[in-house]
Amino acid sequence: MNMEYTLSILKPDVIKRNIIGKVNTYIENSGLKIIAQKTLLLTKVQAENFYIIHKDRAYYQSLVQNMTSGPVVVQVLYGLNAVKKYREIIGATNPCDAKKGTIRGDIAKSIDENTVHGSDSLENADIEIKFFFALIEYAYL
């Protein structure tokens, strides 16, 4: 039984469409707990640094532009196998490929406005959470 933390980011399209609660319902219905949450407006430098691993990809500048186009909601999720579970409920990166019943399959508009970011590994979850949160903001026993 692996109790884990993972990072979730609700992207600007979620806030613009006023569907934060709808996305949170998917998270809560999966059994994951939202133990920390805050709304931020990322600067270009912050977005570039957060997504630095994608720097050489063709979509990098578009991703940075999207992530700085409005507020985001960053969350720390906690639960059994949280990284894997959240990746499953998110669905495929391209909403066209995402299964129904997943966040992206049900509510994402496009690959650019694909609703959420979720950590892809336990190691990246640790790095990504620390990018946005101090330990005191999310320590959960």
From Swiss-Prot:
Residues where ATP binds: K11, Y59, R87, T93, R104, N114
Enzyme class: transferase
Subcellular location per the Swiss-Prot or TrEMBL entry: Cytoplasm
Membrane spanning residue stretches: none
Catalysed conversion reaction: a 2'-deoxyribonucleoside 5'-diphosphate + ATP = a 2'-deoxyribonucleoside 5'-triphosphate + ADP; a ribonucleoside 5'-diphosphate + ATP = a ribonucleoside 5'-triphosphate + ADP
Cofactor section: Mg(2+)
Coiled-coil region: none
Gene Ontology cellular component annotations, sorted alphabetically: cytoplasm
SMART domains per the UniProt record, alphabetical: NDK
Similarity comment: Belongs to the NDK family.
Function: Major role in the synthesis of nucleoside triphosphates other than ATP. The ATP gamma phosphate is transferred to the NDP beta phosphate via a ping-pong mechanism, using a phosphorylated active-site intermediate.
PANTHER family from the UniProt entry: NUCLEOSIDE DIPHOSPHATE KINASE, NUCLEOSIDE DIPHOSPHATE KINASE DDB_G0292928-RELATED
Record-given protein name: Nucleoside diphosphate kinase
Organism listed in the record: Orientia tsutsugamushi (strain Boryong)
Phylogenetic classification of the source organism: Bacteria, Pseudomonadati, Pseudomonadota, Alphaproteobacteria, Rickettsiales
